[in-house]
Each structure stands twice: as structure tokens, then as C-alpha cells.
């Protein structure tokens, strides 16, 4: 059983859902991720989505775009992101670690090279928001050969026939996009989220993890009623931007604990 599968099985047995923070590798400072991930894991985070900086992050709103630009200014590359995963494992981080990035930089780096390196570093998979299902076979097969998962997306606008195609090829968990548009904290989630998740549930036993717009305990409570996990990204990056350097780690951990107060399943 993979580390991702073990994590969701353990949480399910405990009656809880997963909280998965998103962090841009190398933001705010080059080594910040190495300090933040262990602290957030200790605060109760279950998995981590670690963003590879890219100059044209199409799926991301202004908050993560700023974080990405800062990380690029700090000189962060794909190789640095993979090395960060290895260092986090050396620091005894046990949670699943997935790299999120865009396809062109990964293609330039080399799919086989990237999968082999991420597996050797102790990573668990890829999240590639601009990779359509029709073009995913190469990376999906290489990832599987290295015991990595390629996480696939389902959005409110995904047609039923395409949901069936995605669930047939998915592994690890499914990333359920809670609303249309780019990433960013919102006050409310999509009204049809419950129906979307019910439809997907009929077609897969994989865990369903909701992302985009998650920012407050009420959102976590809403997701806990219908899904297996929630991803918090832009709201966490916002906090890191606002906090003074000496308070970033403790403040981020406090935010995770605040969100987790709503994570127990009813």
C-alpha cells in the first residue's frame, strides 16, 4: 500500500478527513519549506502539495503567482524541489509529499529523469493542472513504474462521460476543484459541489480531495460532510506574506490547527 493510501486509510478509520497544505517551494525564503513542512505536519497536516515555481502558472490566482515569482527570484528549480523532498525525508517528515507543477518545465527536465529522482527522494506523486487526460499517458505510466501517483482533476464543468474516463485512469486520490476559475481564497464554495462529489463517488473508491477557495474552518466543515480531504493554498500563502519572518512558522502552524478544529467527520 502506498503512503497516500495508508494515510487515507488511517484517517478514515479515525473518522477524519485529510488537510493538505499547499506551499510554493522556496517561498517566502529559499529554505522556508524545510521549516514549514515539519511544523505543519506536527500541527496535524496529513499530506503536502509542494509547488514548483513556474513563470506562467495558468491555474493560479494572484496570491500564488506572487509566491511563485518570489521563489523564482530565490533561484528555485525543479531539481531544488526534488532535493527539498529528499531533505524533508531526512528530517523525518512522514506525510505524503507531492510536487505540483506545470507540464512544459517537467517535459524539458525529462519525465523519466524527474520520476526517478522524485521516487529516490521519497516523493509520492505529481499534480499537473495543465496536463489533459489525452496527453497524460507518458507521465502516468512513468510515474506508476516508479510507484508514484499522478493526481487527476475533476471540476464542476467536467462532463459525466469525461469523469468516467478520468476515474478509470486515476490513482492516489482525485483532486476535486470546488469552483471554476483560478486558485484563491473565497468566502463560499460552489453550490453544486455536493452533487459533483456524489456523482464521482459512484464511479471510484479513490479518496476525493477538494481544493480551490478553501480558507476557513466553515469550509473544512462543509468539505468534511462530503469528501475525504481539503487543500488549503492561497489562504495559507496570504498568511505567510503578512506574517513577520520570526512568526511565519508558528503562525502557519496555528492556522492549520484552527482549520483542523473543523476536520472531524460528523
Swiss-Prot record:
For biological process, the GO terms are: L-tryptophan biosynthetic process
Enzyme class at the top of the EC tree: lyase
List the top taxonomic levels of the source: Bacteria, Bacillati, Chloroflexota, Chloroflexia, Chloroflexales
PANTHER family assigned to the protein according to its UniProt record, in alphabetical order: TRYPTOPHAN SYNTHASE ALPHA CHAIN, CHLOROPLASTIC, TRYPTOPHAN SYNTHASE, ALPHA CHAIN
Q: Which GO terms describe its cellular component?
A: cytosol
- What is the protein's given name? Tryptophan synthase alpha chain
Give the UniProt keywords, A-Z: Amino-acid biosynthesis, Aromatic amino acid biosynthesis, Lyase, Tryptophan biosynthesis
Q: Which spans of this chain does the record mark as coiled coil?
A: none
Q: Say yes or no: keyword Ubl conjugation present.
A: no
Q: Which residues form the active site?
A: 49 (proton acceptor), 60 (proton acceptor)
The protein's gene is named trpA
Q: Which CDD domains does the record associate with it?
A: Tryptophan_synthase_alpha (cd04724)
Amino acid at each position: 500500500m502506498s503512503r497516500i493510501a495508508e494515510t487515507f486509510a488511517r484517517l478514515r478509520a479515525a473518522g477524519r478527513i485529510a488537510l493538505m497544505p499547499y506551499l510554493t517551494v522556496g517561498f517566502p525564503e529559499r529554505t522556508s519549506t524545510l521549516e514549514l513542512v515539519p511544523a505543519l505536519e506536527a500541527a496535524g497536516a496529513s499530506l503536502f502539495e509542494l509547488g514548483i515555481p513556474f513563470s506562467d502558472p495558468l491555474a493560479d490566482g494572484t496570491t500564488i503567482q506572487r509566491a511563485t515569482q518570489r521563489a523564482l527570484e530565490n533561484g528555485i528549480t525543479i531539481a531544488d524541489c526534488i532535493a527539498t523532498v529528499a531533505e524533508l525525508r531526512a528530517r523525518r517528515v512522514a506525510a505524503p509529499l507531492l510536487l505540483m507543477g506545470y507540464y512544459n518545465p517537467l517535459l524539458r527536465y525529462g519525465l523519466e529523469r524527474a520520476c526517478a529522482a522524485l521516487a529516490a527522494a521519497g516523493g509520492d506523486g505529481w499534480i499537473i493542472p495543465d496536463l489533459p487526460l489525452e496527453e497524460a499517458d507518458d507521465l502516468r505510466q512513468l510515474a506508476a513504474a516508479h510507484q508514484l501517483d499522478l493526481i487527476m482533476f475533476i471540476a464542476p464543468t467536467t462532463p459525466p462521460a469525461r469523469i468516467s474516463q478520468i476515474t478509470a485512469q486515476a490513482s492516489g486520490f482525485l483532486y476535486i476543484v470546488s469552483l471554476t476559475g483560478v486558485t484563491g481564497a473565497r468566502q463560499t464554495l460552489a453550490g453544486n459541489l455536493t452533487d459533483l462529489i456524489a456523482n464521482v463517488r459512484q464511479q471510484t473508491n479513490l479518496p476525493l480531495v477538494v481544493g480551490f477557495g478553501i480558507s476557513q474552518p466553515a469550509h473544512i466543515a462543509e468539505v468534511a460532510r462530503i469528501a475525504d480531504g481539503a487543500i488549503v493554498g492561497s489562504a495559507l500563502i496570504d498568511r505567510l506574506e503578512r506574517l513577520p519572518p520570526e512568526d511565519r512558522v508558528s503562525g502557519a502552524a496555528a492556522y492549520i490547527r484552527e482549520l483542523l478544529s473543523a476536520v472531524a467527520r460528523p
